[in-house]
């Protein structure tokens, strides 16, 4: 594997983790939001990022890319709040499935992964510079 492949792989990982951090930020920002669909109001549905292998040519290894962004399948919460204008006839309001604790943990994980790939890039750059200085 060439050093340039290392740069491509680490760069793709940074890009993918950056997208994941953006989705997490959107989830947290919209945790209290509602969506109007077909004349009805619904709570915001959390999103999740799905990654997939982005293989190098003629290789079993590669970088990573965002395959898709899907709706989180965790159930919505029902909260008893009969004074809420969005409550049903029994007084329950459907609340978002955004879990701030899980989102924070996922944010820390994605940030650490991003930082680790920055270090990989720094190491690869250092190796390239040392390789270039061999001929001096």
Swiss-Prot record:
Where is the major localization of this protein?
other
Superkingdom as given in the UniProt entry: Bacteria
Name the PROSITE patterns for this protein. FLAGELLA_BB_ROD
Tell me if 4Fe-4S is a UniProt keyword of this record: no
Its BP terms in the Gene Ontology are: bacterial-type flagellum-dependent swarming motility
Q: Ion transport as a keyword? A: no
Pfam families cross-referenced by the UniProt entry: Flg_bb_rod, Flg_bbr_C
This protein's UniProt keywords = Bacterial flagellum
User: Cellular component per GO?
Assistant: bacterial-type flagellum basal body, rod
Q: Where does this protein reside within or beyond the cell?
A: Bacterial flagellum basal body
Classification via PANTHER family? FLAGELLAR BASAL-BODY ROD PROTEIN FLGC, FLAGELLAR PROTEIN
Entries under NCBIfam families matching the protein: FlgC
Q: How does it assemble?
A: The basal body constitutes a major portion of the flagellar organelle and consists of four rings (L,P,S, and M) mounted on a central rod. The rod consists of about 26 subunits of FlgG in the distal portion, and FlgB, FlgC and FlgF are thought to build up the proximal portion of the rod with about 6 subunits each.
Give the protein family.
Answer: Belongs to the flagella basal body rod proteins family.
**Name by which UniProt lists this protein:** Flagellar basal-body rod protein FlgC
> In which organism is this protein found?
Buchnera aphidicola subsp. Schizaphis graminum (strain Sg)
What gene, per UniProt, encodes this protein?
Answer: flgC
């Amino acid at each position: 594997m060439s050093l340039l492949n290392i740069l491509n792989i680490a760069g793709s990982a940074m890009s993918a983790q950056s997208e994941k951090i953006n989705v997490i930020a959107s989830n947290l920002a919209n945790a209290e939001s509602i969506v109007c669909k077909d004349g009805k109001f619904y709570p915001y549905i959390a999103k999740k990022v799905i990654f997939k292998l982005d293989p190098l040519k003629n290789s079993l290894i590669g970088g990573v890319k965002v395959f898709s962004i899907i709706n989180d399948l965790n159930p919505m919460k029902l909260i008893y709040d009969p004074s809420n204008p969005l409550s049903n006839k029994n007084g329950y309001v459907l609340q978002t499935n955004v879990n701030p604790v899980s989102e924070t943990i996922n944010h820390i994980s994605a940030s650490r992964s991003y930082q680790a790939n920055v270090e990989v890039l720094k190491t690869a750059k250092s190796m390239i510079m040392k390789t270039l200085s061999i001929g001096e």
